[in-house]
Amino acid sequence: MDKYGHIAHQEGDVCYYIPRLFKYNSYYSGTEDVRIFVGDLKYRMRVSLQICEKYYDRRLSMLFWKNHPLQQIHLIGCIIGLQFKWIGKQEYIFFQLDDCTSDSSLVGYTSDMRFLTCKVKKDSILSWGLNITDLIGLTLHVYGQASLNYQELQVEYLRLCYSLTEEIDHWKITMNMREQLDTPWSLSDFVIGELFTQEQEWTPETSQIEVVNPDFVGIGYKTPESKRNETTFIEQLQEERLKDELEIISPYNSTDTSNSVHSLSFRFVSSLKDFPETHFLNSGDQIDNGNDEQLKKLEYQSANLPVMIPNRTSAKSNLMLILLGLQMKEISNSDLYKLKEVRSVVTSLASFLFQQQNVGVMKSFDSLEKEAFRDLVNRLVSQGLIGLKDKTSETFDLLPLKNLFEYAEKRISVLMKLQCYTGTVQLSHVQEKLHLPYITTNGIVDVFKECLKRTKKQYPEVLKNWWIDLDPKNGMEDQNSGILLHLEYAAAYS
């Protein structure tokens, strides 16, 4: 019965109470540690947004599980990627959390639906004793409150999850919490009557409308007064201008103003930004395959060159593909230099370097060609992709490159068949399994990059996107360092 006006909406036996009564819910008041899975949280945020719009006339923004109002929640997950953003004068970090509980069977399933976006102040992370460069790949306890408008988590505290046992215990508690939250919250009429009587006793000389919160009449609702009705026309203009300025610097900027849910366009950034010779795509720390149109544009502008070679990295990539196509296990330095395809790559790179020279110190084109060839070969040797059979005869062993590429193809094929979204490639494992003691993380990255490009081209209906991050848990010289592969599948395939 709603004789006290304490129910905002009722569906069968489930009552959605007015906000004033939320404090009597143990999950809202903080007496219970509310643990939630990432998949459940993302679903509940979408449902809660509809509940607040339909049942509370958009005068409330609250996370609900059934009719339980929830404030601070507790999750455990692995940080998959992060991004830095300045909002006003404060620097924030937006990271994505995954605990493998999101439903991948949804139509149009994307990585944004799989991962939970979390927002935290950079200064706060430092105050908790965490190293920002080591965040990616870590499993953390995350505490915070849900933001329905932006469908993200406002982080209040982070701490490390130190063991698998700790993570398993969290999962057990969360499963039990699930069952408890599935039981609707209810307050008896007797309790409601007592609360109503207490309200009258606290302010006996005040009228019913004045005694309560402006959002309620008695214990029920009263339409809140709009702030706009209290402002002048000039103040309204100033307010609109301020909103415009805030929107410009907001990371939630969206061209669709009809919907209050703004999606943050997320890019993954490697935490090791000083990694030499990796050239992780546009951002400098990440490898991606979304620059096809840019490559076509450069190819058109450089049509007079035999091969489009904008820099040493692209030239090295082209040389590596040429070596993979050779039907031989070894080749001499002189024979390699005489190959038509290699000459084309070297000539194009030398042309590029020739145009970049300082007028005061000019080298001949022939000398630049020889230097470019030596530099490209030395880079592959230093990465362990090709070996020197004999220093006197300068014969190159091509088996390391071929074996690693074959391993990369098989590894990516397995990940795709299992529909895995991430995969780890450890340097020490590759060195031992393939008997390549001189292979480096740089070399592994370059080979997997080319293999992923080829796979996406062969199976565009399956593999939608991919990117590579460095494994942040170890330094580059550490034998246990490696890379993280991220795969995003097409909606029809997933």
UniProtKB/Swiss-Prot annotation:
Question: Per UniProt, what is one Pfam family of this protein?
Answer: Stn1
Q: From the UniProt entry, list the residue stretches annotated as the region Winged helix-turn-helix (wHTH) 2.
A: 396-494
Give the superkingdom in one word: Eukaryota
Q: Which keywords does UniProt give here?
A: Chromosome, Telomere
Residue ranges forming the DNA-binding region read 62-159
Q: Show the InterPro entries listed in the entry.
A: Stn1_C_fungi (IPR024263), Stn1_C_sf (IPR038240), Stn1_N (IPR018856)
GO molecular function per UniProt: single-stranded telomeric DNA binding; translation elongation factor binding
An example GO BP is: negative regulation of telomere maintenance via telomerase
Q: Note the Gene3D superfamilies from the entry.
A: 2.40.50.1040, Stn1, C-terminal wHTH domain, Stn1, N-terminal wHTH domain
This entry carries the following GO cellular component terms, namely: chromosome, telomeric region; CST complex
Tell me the compartments it is located in. Chromosome, Telomere
Q: Where is this region: Winged helix-turn-helix (wHTH) 1?
A: 311-397
Q: What is known of its domains?
A: The C-terminal wHLH region seems to mediate telomere-specific function.
Assembly, per entry: Interacts with CDC13 and TEN1.
Tell me the function of this protein.
Has a role in telomere length regulation and telomere end protection. Acts as an inhibitor of telomerase loading through its interaction with CDC13.
Write the protein's name.
Protein STN1
